[in-house]
């Protein structure tokens, strides 16, 4: 019994770790969270953005030259959208800790992304979407998925 307890305690932190989603798995999760056609952007746009922002990895982080960091599956920036406790002048417009964006549960990322895309720039806020997805056949990202 003691061995089982030790084993459970060793693996308990893994439950809080992030996740690398499969393409169709992420498409289904994003659809459940209401991203399909949100602000006029089809589901394929969101899946494409996630691919080129994080390679579908909820734990992705990238430090920027201005000292801010991008977090999670949609690489949401700490200067404007979340608080990481180390970005001077963070606006935290989504009112969340950046660590919430690294969870295997994409709810916080989706809710924040909805605020971002509702801004005047829409999905142009995501550099990877602008450079790799905009104007392409983004429906290819959900083709073959059972949604």
Curated annotation (Swiss-Prot):
InterPro entries, alphabetized? Glyco_hydro_22 (IPR001916), Glyco_hydro_22_CS (IPR019799), Glyco_hydro_22_lys (IPR000974), Lysozyme-like_dom_sf (IPR023346)
Give compartment(s). Answer: Secreted
Cystines in this chain: 24-145, 48-133, 82-98, 94-112
A Pfam short name: Lys
Q: Which UniProt keywords apply?
A: Antimicrobial, Bacteriolytic enzyme, Disulfide bond, Glycosidase, Hydrolase, Secreted, Signal
A GO molecular-function annotation: lysozyme activity
Q: Which GO cellular component term is one of those annotated?
A: extracellular region
All copies of the C-type lysozyme domain together span 19-147
Q: Which residues form the active site?
A: 53, 70
Q: Which SUPFAM superfamilies match?
A: Lysozyme-like (SSF53955)
- Write out the GO biological process terms: defense response to Gram-negative bacterium; defense response to Gram-positive bacterium; killing of cells of another organism
| Superkingdom of this protein's organism | Eukaryota
Which Enzyme Commission numbers does its entry carry? 3.2.1.17
Q: Where is the signal peptide?
A: 1-18
Instruction: Name the chemical reaction catalysed here.
Output: Hydrolysis of (1->4)-beta-linkages between N-acetylmuramic acid and N-acetyl-D-glucosamine residues in a peptidoglycan and between N-acetyl-D-glucosamine residues in chitodextrins
Give the main localization category: secreted
Which regions span the lipid bilayer?
Answer: none
Question: Which EC class heads this enzyme's classification?
Answer: hydrolase
Q: Which Gene3D superfamilies does this UniProt record tie to the protein?
A: 1.10.530.10
Function, as annotated, reads: Lysozymes have primarily a bacteriolytic function; those in tissues and body fluids are associated with the monocyte-macrophage system and enhance the activity of immunoagents.
What else does UniProt say about it?
Lysozyme C is capable of both hydrolysis and transglycosylation; it also shows a slight esterase activity. It acts rapidly on both peptide-substituted and unsubstituted peptidoglycan, and slowly on chitin oligosaccharides.
Q: How does it assemble?
A: Monomer.
Q: What family classification does the UniProt entry report for this protein? A: Belongs to the glycosyl hydrolase 22 family.
What protein am I looking at? Lysozyme C
Q: Which organism is it from?
A: Coturnix japonica
Q: Which gene encodes it?
A: LYZ
